[in-house]
Amino acid sequence: FKNKFRYYLNSILSKINFSYNLSMLFQLLILTILILTLLTALIYPPNTPDSLSYHMSKVMHWIQNGNVEFYSTAITRQLYLSPFSEFVILHLQLLTNGDYLANLVQWFSMIGCMITVSLINKEFGGNNKSQLFSALFCATIPMGILQSTSTQTDYVVSLWIIILAYFIVRYKTTKSIKYIYAFAVALGLALITKQTAYIYALPFCVWFLFLTLKRPDHFLLLFTIPIIISLINFGQFKRNFELYGNPIGIHS
């Protein structure tokens, strides 16, 4: 009986395309997470203490004042912290006359992270199934699921840092100069999104520096990186310097 059972079981299993079914399972799980988080982001308005006291309050002050200059407030982090995510929310707020789409900034950033992680996997030789698994791993990070339905900035800055890492990998593979400029833009956007990028981007900057040391002609182009970063962050650097005397604000 055991031999017959084993025979029939092996016959059934041999007819199942596990590779195909596993890929379908990964896609189904990713789609389920995206749909559930999208519905949550659309149905529920921004309601975390951080959203109400910082992110959305900053946006409403800008709308009320008609500009993004600093204003009088007891919550000074509304001023000196990097404002990129809130700039995007500001546009959505004005276009829809409400906060209906405010949570989608982080939700789309989650999708961007999933795509970029899968592309990095591909650069290291991953096949379609491993790329899907990478995207699924990214989508199932518990804090990521919570962040994807809020107006916080962690997923947005994560997106820029992951893109930055992808450009480093592409530069290592192709040695193309365009990835030096792409790296600079991604780094500048990360810094204008959240100031923790100064810490988390540092190891990638060191890695990129070592890669360019192997190409003296490319190494000289590194001097364009701080210029690009300064251009992207100029407005916030200027406002912080005028009020606090330094470009990154009160805690420097």
Report each predicted region and the residues it spans.
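Membrane-interface alpha helices of multi-pass inner-membrane proteins
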Residues: S134, I168, Y179-Q195, P203-C205, ...
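Start-transfer (signal-anchor) and selected internal transmembrane alpha helices
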Residues: F1-L38, L220-I228
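Transmembrane-helix motifs of polytopic, lipid-linked glycan transferases
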Residues: L34, L101-G125, I163
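Extracytoplasmic catalytic/substrate-binding loops of multi-pass membrane glycan-assembly enzymes
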Residues: Y44-K58, Q64-V88, T96-Y100, Y244-G249
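Transmembrane-helix signature of polytopic, membrane-embedded enzymes
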Residues: Y100-L101, V117-P142, L159, T173-K175
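Membrane-interface transmembrane helices that cradle and orient dolichyl/undecaprenyl
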Residues: L164-Y179, F210, K214
